[in-house]
Amino acid sequence: MSQLRTTKAGLVACGMICAFIFLYLRNPGPEEAEAEAEAEPTNPAVVECGFYPDELCSALFDGKKAAPQIAQFCKPPQNSEVPARLRTPGNCSRLARGLHFITRPLSAEEGNFSLAYVIHAPRELVMFVRLLRAIYAPQNVYCIHSDENAPKKFKSAMQTFVDCFGNIFLSSKTQKVAHDNLRRLQAEIDCMRDLVHSPFQWHYVMNLCGQEFPIKTNKEIIYDIRTRWKGKNITPGVTPPANSKPKTGQGPPKPSPDENSYTAPNTIFKQSPPHNLTISSGSAHYALTRKFVEFVLTDPRAKDMLQWSKDIQSPEKHYWVTLNRLKDAPGATPDAGWEGHIRATKWRTEAGDGRKGCTDHDAQDTCVYGLGDLPGLIRLPAFFATLEPSSDPLVGVCLERRHRLRALQQAEVPPEPHWQFPQQSHFNSQPHH
């Protein structure tokens, strides 16, 4: 009898421990939360990862303090779904279904408001396809430009992919893209020309690189553009004060992490700006109306400024915001500042208390988003966030699954089976030492 009581006590204790672990991620109380903050990651022989990744992603988005620690151990084998699909012979319909592309407009509003995208494809094909899968809609149109020196294998895979979609095409011109060089700006303008000549009647165009990922759904982006901007361009930036207008030998104003602020010039003008333009400075990211794009492609001031921009640093950070300050430009916002949240940016100076999760810094002094950033990231008003290659892969996985879930929840049409991502999987993981 004594042995039986001991066994029962052991079973009860085991059950309590299991229940505690189950609730540890989901809803810790104040005492548990305090203990989590002080706890150090352990290295058990085997980690119970549960239904991966949805349970863990949910805990990360909810800000459970134990979740990033558990994520250190729960890393399944690298997903090779995208390259496998591109290598497998088959028709394009099978490719779209296999990669879970949404193939119908999800609402009448979206179907009647086409967006265009100019996308710089990185050399990481999987990251690019995941971005395109998230922002893809059959009523939208996508122009892809890549470095002309990209590997032939990458170019071939890219061509195979875009050939399966009538609304995705490669730019008619290629550039040797460098970060601080006119070639990036020229590549985007080349794509815009292709988009204007395409049969798609798009309303706005936005630019992305393959390392970015949407925080907002297509429906949410359209709602913000239509209700807040109402035919205006979005070019966040700043114009120098009237008493500090740059002259020859001076540079344009430098964007500052502190919105609506102006800092000293950082570039030297070899020549005065054409047409006596006042050079503004801001984000290289934009949302532009079709009429404004047509203006950029034909107006002498825009053409002359493009030629003049060859001699300045990071011209893409000055070109769009300067032209959008011209009062006679279609959709212009002459008095705008940093309004318009296109890309989320966390500056290194902001990575203090309450801004945890900054795991690295890129060359532009901005933080790379980590697992600890997810709760705050999804609450930002920005449309997109940059996911550097050094980011934890789970950051992109969680954002992708959340984005697809929200898109289908907002849909006004019944979802097709292939729009859903594969069911969750349950596995144990050997810790990574």
Swiss-Prot record:
Coiled coil: none annotated. GO terms for biological process: protein glycosylation. One of its GO terms (cellular component) is Golgi membrane. Its EC number is 2.4.1.-. Residues 258-275, 421-433 have a biased composition (Polar residues). GO terms for molecular function: glycosyltransferase activity. Glycans are attached at N112. Pathway: Protein modification; protein glycosylation. It is found in: Golgi apparatus membrane. It is a single-pass type II membrane protein. Residues 26-433 are extracellular. It comes from the Eukaryota. Keywords: Disulfide bond, Glycoprotein, Glycosyltransferase, Golgi apparatus, Membrane, Signal-anchor, Transferase, Transmembrane, Transmembrane helix. Residues 1-8 are cytoplasmic. The keyword Disulfide bond applies. Residues 233-275, 413-433 are annotated as: Disordered. The chain crosses the membrane at residues 9-25. Disulfide bonds join C57-C209, C143-C358, C164-C191, C367-C398. Belongs to the glycosyltransferase 14 family. Probable glycosyltransferase. This is Probable beta-1,3-galactosyl-O-glycosyl-glycoprotein beta-1,6-N-acetylglucosaminyltransferase 7. It comes from Mus musculus (Mouse). The lineage of its organism: Eukaryota, Metazoa, Chordata, Craniata, Vertebrata. The gene is Gcnt7.
